[in-house]
Amino acid sequence: MQTLNTLDLQTTSLKIVDGKLWILDQQTLPQRQEWLSADTVELLIEHIQALRVRGAPLIGLSASLLLALLAERGLPQAQLEQALIALRESRPTAVNLMNNLARMQQALLHANWVAAMTHEALRLVEEDRELCERIAQHGVQLVKPDSNLLTHCNTGGLATAGIGTAIGVLLRAHQQGKIKQVWVDETRPLLQGGRLTAWELGELGIPYQLICDSMAASLMAQGRVDAVWVGADRIAANGDVANKIGTYSLAVLANYHRIPFYVAAPHTTHDPDCPNGAAIPIEQRDASEVKGVSGGFGHCQWAPANAPVYNPAFDVTPAALISGWVLDSGVITPGQVAAGFFQPKN
């Protein structure tokens, strides 16, 4: 039987070495590349909530791999069930975590549950790699030659086991010579665009320029953006999409300027039991993230220490503002969504 304890597995941002789970600290990038132990449920939850490990697909994969490792070490089923529940509650918006853990829970019910959990965790990693490739294959067909594209937050190998979702599309388009430049929103308040996407695009050799979030409207008005590409943390049954805060603003701007707005995501991000965007739980984060900044580059606070802060991690983009949902199964059109593509199947 193949076991994680004897397997060295590595993606861009997580790895298993000598039977232990490690994550690349995404709070210290790009200044430092530091690997942190995520070998207990408590540690992994701390890393997830501190955004040291982030991205809807990657959160689900890291939780699944840790559960399989714990099973191989002999943790009893009852304790694994408790670990699964704790991990499920670590971040409420990203549905990939719930979907992956539902599959791990089914494996836990298997007669040979240790082997079943290992098999399922490895299968989830391989599936995510394949899903990223399929998304890119479909999405690249929508990219016109000599394109200036705009992206938000981080949707690459740092957020998945593969080449990424929206960034995967950009990579394949770049390899086909279709990209003139990518505009990278810095993505306030935690700067996932400025810290992570800029770093990834640089590593991939994709030409880009970093912008403040507030500059996107000006670029669109000048005709310097041909399409917007973003990822998703949850897709509701009516096609509404929850994604990093600021995504909705871009969708409104793109709609006004008649610019295509595409959402790239695996089918595992779809939640048929969630009727619409209003039903998606939106995580509220600590006020300190808005009043200042911290990371591998140090710490700075610019707002009054007692300033009241509103800090949702995500917003919801209505389906009416989306030009296409680029899934691993293909490009889903607004007409298909209106006809019930994302609705629960009886």
Curated annotation (Swiss-Prot):
Disulfide bonds: none annotated. One of its GO terms (molecular function) is S-methyl-5-thioribose-1-phosphate isomerase activity. Pathway: Amino-acid biosynthesis; L-methionine biosynthesis via salvage pathway; L-methionine from S-methyl-5-thio-alpha-D-ribose 1-phosphate: step 1/6. InterPro entries: IF-2B-related, IF-M1Pi, IF_2B-like_C, Initiation_fac_2B_a/b/d, M1Pi_N, NagB/RpiA_transferase-like. Its EC number is 5.3.1.23. Pfam families: IF-2B (PF01008). It catalyses: 5-(methylsulfanyl)-alpha-D-ribose 1-phosphate = 5-(methylsulfanyl)-D-ribulose 1-phosphate. Coiled coil: none annotated. It is an enzyme of class 5 (isomerase). The active site is at 233 (proton donor). One of its GO terms (biological process) is L-methionine salvage from methylthioadenosine. Keywords: Amino-acid biosynthesis, Isomerase, Methionine biosynthesis. It comes from the Bacteria. The record marks 153 as: Transition state stabilizer. Substrate binds at residues 54-56, 91, 192, 243-244. Belongs to the eIF-2B alpha/beta/delta subunits family. MtnA subfamily. HAMAP family: Salvage_MtnA. Catalyzes the interconversion of methylthioribose-1-phosphate (MTR-1-P) into methylthioribulose-1-phosphate (MTRu-1-P). This is Methylthioribose-1-phosphate isomerase. The lineage of its organism: Bacteria, Pseudomonadati, Pseudomonadota, Gammaproteobacteria, Enterobacterales.
